[in-house]
């Protein structure tokens, strides 16, 4: 989509790229400030985790601007936060997702209409995650996606990645599958 957008609408693509670059430092600061108290809570929970910033693609930004008739500055979800954790065990994966949700909702006020539970009710393609939108201390809504490592692998590599968890993981074939999937991405 981004590649097509770049060549179909080069001026719009360039304008969005320039605005993304111009606001990058602001987004980085917001990410660091927003995630610092989340990291403290997750450390207390004792689950291994990583937190990533997800930046909306130029095409997705443009598409939202077109569909909602809004400006670049009016798009609140250019930055999203992704929490990827390793559950205590397979049986606790769902509970761990919701425990993380509860912990971060104590730090930041959740948007009452923006909780998406694809953990209890996965999408047809196998996608699972909790998406919640939280109000930062700077008054910005920020989407947070909560996923286990398994859920992240399925989201990034497709449902075929799910088999390694069913088989116990760690096989030589798993590495070959990952290499192959990266070549076709």
Protein language model features and the residues they cover:
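Nucleic-acid processing machinery
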Residues: 1-185
